[in-house]
């Protein structure tokens, strides 16, 4: 199993535990990163590397950046067989919720937002895993 996918599973389990404890901010953050890391595994399965993209510095990226991952997942037509556009767009929604959760202390994160974040991460991971299994039976 790809190292990023292993991490995605660990983070999703953390998100579920946090959700059960009513810790909605942390749930949203962990769920986003679970989805994010599964997308990294998907991109790398296509042979893509961070250096294929321009990073925030204006030079080839030295690591996967959130802006790169969320943009590529939504715009790369090769990935549409794995993550449909509506699912891919949900990664952007999750990112926005993670920013709210981590940096906007005055905003409340609802149980529904946290639950939805976990469900979306689970769906993205399942799609990526299904694709990777089909490619490497």
For every predicted segment, state its role.
Residues 1-137:
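Terminal alpha-helical segments
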């Amino acid at each position: 199993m790809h190292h990023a996918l292993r991490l995605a599973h660990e983070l999703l389990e953390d998100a579920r535990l946090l959700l059960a404890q009513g810790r909605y901010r942390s749930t949203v953050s962990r769920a986003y990163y679970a989805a994010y890391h599964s997308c990294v595994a998907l991109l790398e399965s296509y042979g893509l590397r961070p250096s294929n993209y321009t990073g925030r510095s204006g030079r080839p990226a030295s690591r996967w950046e959130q802006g790169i991952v969320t943009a590529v997942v939504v715009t790369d037509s090769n990935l549409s067989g794995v993550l449909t556009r509506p699912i891919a767009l949900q990664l952007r929604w999750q990112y926005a919720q993670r920013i709210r959760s981590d940096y906007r202390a005055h905003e409340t994160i609802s149980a529904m937002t946290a639950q939805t974040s976990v469900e979306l991460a689970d769906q993205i991971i399942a799609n990526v895993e299904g694709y990777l299994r089909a490619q490497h039976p």
